Amino acid sequence: MRSLCRLLRASVLIAAVGCHVHQVAPLDPERLSQEEMLQEHFTNVYDAVASLRSGWLTVRGTDSFKQTSQIWVYYDENRLGSVDEMRSVLVNSVASLRHYDGVDATMRWGVGHSAGAIQILSHK
């Protein structure tokens, strides 16, 4: 009888743990795939980033005492503009996105990137 109670408790515990739903962290917090964006039914890239990787839109660092820093957006290797430009880029037209912090963005694209950059990668 005692072993039957233990077995019943173990079964209930396993069932409860197995049914627990939890959020899974993104595989790479510096990348965002088209699949992730489409899975959540986003149509434009800005809304996807604002919802799934909101930290990418937070300005950190300054370029000078007079001007506030800006996060730059690149489409492949071409500067698109500010993050607002992502509103016009459709999720279906991109393969993935990559975030660069200020140091990495400055190393890649030069001075004026202390706030970082977001690179939109097309289907090549």
Predicted regions and their residues:
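Bacterial Sec signal peptide processing site at the extreme N-terminus
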Residues: 15-33
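Short, polar/charged loop or turn motifs at beta-strand boundaries
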Residues: 27-46, 72-80, 122
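Periplasmic plug
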Residues: 65-103
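A beta-strand signature from Gram-negative outer-membrane beta-barrel systems
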Residues: 94-124
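Post-signal-peptide N-terminal segment of Sec-exported extracytoplasmic proteins
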Residues: 39-64
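Extracytoplasmic
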Residues: 27, 40, 52, 66-70, ...
